[in-house]
Amino acid sequence: MKRICSIYQSSKKSGMYLYVLKSDALERVPEGLMAAFGKAKHSFDLVLTPERKLASEDIAVVLENLEKQGYHLQMPPAEEEYIEHLPEELLRRNDPV
């Protein structure tokens, strides 16, 4: 199953993206989600196939969500994941001596 998908970036939350079928645009996305998502800025279009690898999402889940509900919401990474990637110097900067 091949799908042409448009990916939009949230104006309210860094790292939050919305995947929709290009042919549907944002028509199938619920109003409540759009209110929480903010202004949708088009990032790029992508051809999705089950064989394709995505950087931070499971392609099978994305394709299933697009088929069933018409969109897939990619949430930003958890805050703990950001902290794990900080240099040791920054992690210890405010530690008491």
Swiss-Prot record:
**SUPFAM superfamilies assigned to the protein according to its UniProt record, in alphabetical order:** YcgL-like
PROSITE patterns per record: YCGL (PS51648)
Q: What sequence ranges are listed for the domain YcgL?
A: 3-87
Q: What is this protein called?
A: YcgL domain-containing protein Pfl01_1389
Q: What is the lineage of its organism?
A: Bacteria, Pseudomonadati, Pseudomonadota, Gammaproteobacteria, Pseudomonadales
